[in-house]
Amino acid sequence: MRTNQKCLAVIVVLLVGLVLAYGAMDSALNRSKKELTSPIATAQNAIHIPGSTIEINQSFSTIDPASQWVVVSKQFPLANPAYRPADLHKVSVASRLDKPDDELSLRQKVEPSLTAMFAAANKQGYAIMMASGFRSYQQQQTYFDSYTAAYGREKAETFSAHPGQSEHQTGLALDIAYTDMNNCYLEICFGQTPAGIWLAAHAHDYGFILRYPANKTAVTQYQYEPWHFRYVGKPLAKALYESGFTLDEVKPYLEKH
Ligand SMILES: [Zn+2]
């Protein structure tokens, strides 16, 4: 009996000891976890684009067509030509109504930033609209064929994408114009209009970038398009604006993170 009681006591002491030791270990582990995820880890994972002070604490694929950082260009066509975003929806901002519903649509996730940017532009007195949003592969094919017929292939290629190579197909890009289509509608002079100047200077505050700048035609392989804006989210948009780099130029850099 005595021996049994002693044994029991020893077991109880051992169990209590184990529980206490586990508790101490657990809190020590939690403490070190916290230390690892706060400032040090953040600093290590943040992306800094050279020439910008912005710390980008998010990261997205540059290849996945559903990613807000995807690069779709002549060099990097969509892997799946039939790609169509799952969350396409008709935008609520002013848009060119004589276009098919598809083209009046963008991805749902762009909507809050788009409405905020248009509201700010309207407040400045600029009556603007979305002239073109999402374009399916077939739609782009139709446009490219008609431009080729009108201007010849070489000229058409400077301003119109081959189907599968247009970022309009991601539902993250849009063309912006004055509602008055006589005012530099999808023309280079739009960049010199008050709305064009304002958009170039403020789009990044809403997560958009001027995708084909005048001084980067050799990099983007597209002519200067002061009307074409692309959603990438605020941190990257601000970093690109500050640094002067295009999305194409930072692609390899973003992929390292
Ligand atoms: Zn465009």
Give the residues covered by each predicted segment.
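Extracytoplasmic cell-surface/polysaccharide-interacting catalytic and binding patches
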Residues: 2-132, 137-257
